Structure formats: C-alpha cells, structure tokens
Amino acid sequence: MGKAYYVKFETPEDLVNPILEAVRVASTSGKVKKGTNEATKAIERGTSKLIVIAEDVEPPEVVAHLPILCEEQGAAFAFVPSKQELGKSLGIDITSAAAAILDAGDAQHIVDQVVSSIAKIKGGKTDQ
C-alpha cells in the first residue's frame, strides 16, 4: 500500500527515531499537545515548534488538513510511519494521529536538528 495522499514528503528512516525521541523527551521535560484537534489549535495559534503526523491514519481526512495548515502558517512538520509509535512516544496507551511540540524542553537540540533536516528535504520551505 502506498503512502496516504496527505504525506507531502518522504521522511528518511534515520530521521524517524529522532522525531519520536524528540516527542518522548519533550513530553516529559517540555510541553506537548496530543491529538489532531490540539495540533490544529497549536498551528493556528503559532505556538508549535514541531507538528508530528502519523502516516497510517484512517480515514486520512482526519489529519489531511494539517500539512496544508502548517505550510500556510510556516509551521515545521514531520511524518512518522505509525500512530501506535507516536502514541507510545507521547507516553499514552492509545494511538495518536498527531502531536504538537510547544516547548521542547530537554529535546530542543533534537527538535532543531529535525526541523533543519526537514527543511533540507522540503527544499528550505520550513520557516522555523
């Protein structure tokens, strides 16, 4: 099965673990919002450092607006293959379609590296 239509770029495998690690560390030492609705609000308010979106969300319409909104607002975003892994990184026992890192806490250097790497992949379009 191919990637969902909302996946705007291929996240390299060697970047997936740092993204999940950033979520894990930020959720304990910083501030992270869980879920699509919270991620949407963080983008609209301009408070997100990084939006993380799962690639295996069904139906895809649940998160399809997030990449578009991120591009409109200049917010950094990345994809991870599994909503299960994203939920686990958030420290919750259920899946999560999306998450927003508001304050990276001890993960700031990881978030900076991820945002920089994503900007290179996208051709420098990420403003953060």
From Swiss-Prot:
Major place of residence: cytoplasm
One term of GO molecular function: rRNA binding
Keyword tags: Cytoplasm, Ribonucleoprotein, Ribosomal protein, RNA-binding, rRNA-binding, tRNA processing
GO biological process, one term: translation
Keyword tRNA processing: yes
Listed GO CC annotations: cytoplasm; ribonucleoprotein complex; ribosome
Gene3D superfamilies named in the record: 3.30.1330.30
Compartments, record wording: Cytoplasm
Any one Pfam family match given in the protein's UniProt record, by short name: Ribosomal_L7Ae
Record note on quaternary structure: Part of the 50S ribosomal subunit. Probably part of the RNase P complex.
Family: Belongs to the eukaryotic ribosomal protein eL8 family.
Function description: Multifunctional RNA-binding protein that recognizes the K-turn motif in ribosomal RNA, the RNA component of RNase P, box H/ACA, box C/D and box C'/D' sRNAs.
HAMAP family tied to this protein: Ribosomal_eL8
Designated name of the protein: Large ribosomal subunit protein eL8
Gene designation: rpl7ae
